[in-house]
Amino acid sequence: MRTRRRTAALAATLALAAAWAGSANATEKPEELVVQKMPPWHPHEIYIVDISMPSMTDGRIYVYDADAKKLLGQIDGGFGPGFAIAPDRKASVVATTYFSRGSHSTRTDVVEIIDNTTLDHAGEIVIPAKHAQHVPSPYNTAFSADGKRLYVANITPAASVTVIDAVSKKVLSEIDTAACVLAYPGDNDRFTALCESGKALTVTLDANGKEAKRTMSDAFIDVDKDPAFVNASRYKGDYLFTTYGGNVRSADFSGDKPAFGKPWSLLTDAERAEGWRPGGMQQTAVQAKQNRYYVLMHKGTDGSHKDPGTQVWVYDLKSKQRVARWDLTQQKVEPLVSIQVSEDDKPLFYGLTATSDLVVMDARTGALQHVEKQIGNTSSLLVNP
């Protein structure tokens, strides 16, 4: 009898062990990894470029949904990334540098192509190892209006621009820009670079992407008395350049010879005497549908042009008059270093603080909507496709 009981108990134990083992094996089955697709694009999707000063070989681009108030994903940026979104929004590019030993040894510069539906790496183009490595600018890496050409600014310290066929994904040429920097796209076959003299160099390309013609303008910026910020804002085909002293001048780079508008002031004499002036890293933004110009302002002196803005001044670009003045401290918002505005019927205003907080406000009223804490290490450029 005891033998039967022991046998039955042993059988039950073995059956239980087998069942447990089967269950364990079932739960430990490797999970199949999938890449989720991005939600459909909408105008309140903002890209945030971070050069990542504490670890500069590991720059990042973050994608944020301001309606859902959540981070959608990130793109690897490498060292000193230049970033641009194709006009059709289907892809982005990152012009960057990699070293074979992480932070040193053999250098390779590439333009990486990103599929915007997944944020996956979709290919790369090896470019001359001259890509300019500096605080991100919208004109370090830029598409032509039709998206068929891509311009990448180089500094070695000699200045040049690499011209790329974005369709065939091939380098077409490298244009010596004679100490003039960055690449402001004009018509589909030309770009303009800014010169230290305050002049503008426009290069016209032939059908093969080679230089066909170049034109140097007269100085439109007084670099000694009133230098201008290089991060100009686009408005109806023109570029709006704002100076350290608070003046604005439009530049039309669409033709083979640049044309410039008459300067106008952001400040009254009394405001200028009080020390108000523009500042920050990405100091201005345009909302073309409403003809609005947003400018970061602070009280400062000569040399304070990179100081963050404690206020946002809003101008009507038709009348060139200020229509609003937002004091950020009244909403307990930290000073902003960079700004951007969405281009839609219910526009949002975006700002970055010095600690990489993303501030979202109603672009029509200035009412605070949300603050997303610390997106990145040293984020400084906002791109709204």
Roles of regions detected by a PLM:
Residues 28-33, 68-75, 79-81, 120-132, ...:
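A short beta-strand motif characteristic of beta-propeller blades
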Residues 40-53, 94-108, 295-309:
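Short, conserved, GDST-rich strand-edge loop motifs in beta-rich repeat architectures
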Residues 43-45, 88-91, 146-148, 188-190, ...:
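Short coil/turn segments that connect the beta-strands within blades of beta-propeller domains
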Residues 52-56, 98-103, 157-158, 198-200, ...:
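Short glycine/acidic-enriched loop and turn motifs that connect beta-strands
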Residues 65-68, 116-118, 165-169, 205-208, ...:
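Short loop/turn segments that connect beta-strands within beta-propeller blades
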